[in-house]
Amino acid sequence: MFVRLLCLFFCLLIKPVIAAETLEIGKINTQKLEEIFSFYQYHGEKDYLMIPEYNYPPIFCNYFPDDFTKITDEKKRNALFIKILAPLTLKLNNQILSERNEIKSIAQDFKNQKTLSPKQISILEEKAKKYDVFTRLQGTYRQQYQIDELLIKVHVVAPSILIIAAALETNWGTSRIVKEGNSLYKTLVWHTDEGLKPIGETEDDTYRIKTYPNIYASMEEFALKLNSSISFDNFRGFRHQVIERKTLLLGSTLAPYLVWNSPLKNYAGLFEYTLSYYELNIIDKSILNSKMIAKELPQNLQKFIM
């Protein structure tokens, strides 16, 4: 009896190892990040294309490695850049799809009942504000308009688009705006001292480069811009047509409908070349798979997990 009680006592002390569904990585250097990637066998064709499974591990980096810019091998550095961003793009699209499903559920209730609960109306108003859906209509006409517009605006952004735009705006993660401000898309803010002061770009001192708490926040805001700004109406309209045809959303299909005010010459040409050369449409077809990180990290690597 005593032995049984003793065994039970020690069993209670030993906590079972529960496989993580995601890994959030904090400050880290390149060597340790690559050790984590290697431990979870996160390497594929060209190092970053996870084929033929099309599965990516939910390993989410909050920042680029401290010594990322010191990687002298451009091929290796660009591959690591893609490996860092790919899981984040898939995470972001899962988040957007969750929002979309919430709107679709409200739309179905509205279709069936011709009315909505106060909570559902509040959710619609919140989403309409977030995605810049404006109307002076009232009552059910207002709700129908909001639903129709939100179902066009709230949808995934091809991962290849998010990765390439970040690569071109930050010179593949080597720009100071990444290290100093976690900025992937060089978003500007005006008439404020908050943010990074531009260096060698202009004599205009009225704007700053927006900074973020982590690189995911930068990506999240950029996707919201694509899904809400009037500048991207044509992009969203064509995306909606693709969805209606039940065709896979690929960056190569959508890229011609994107226009950025970028100082880079031949931005569209650079965009299409980069997409094709790095075969990033493969990531557009991929998903996150938490089974890939089922093993517990060694103790020496666990300290980098947030």
What do these predicted regions represent?
Residues 5-13:
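Sec-dependent N-terminal signal peptides
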Residues 19-164, 168, 172-306:
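Catalytic cores of secreted/periplasmic lytic hydrolases that degrade extracellular macromolecules
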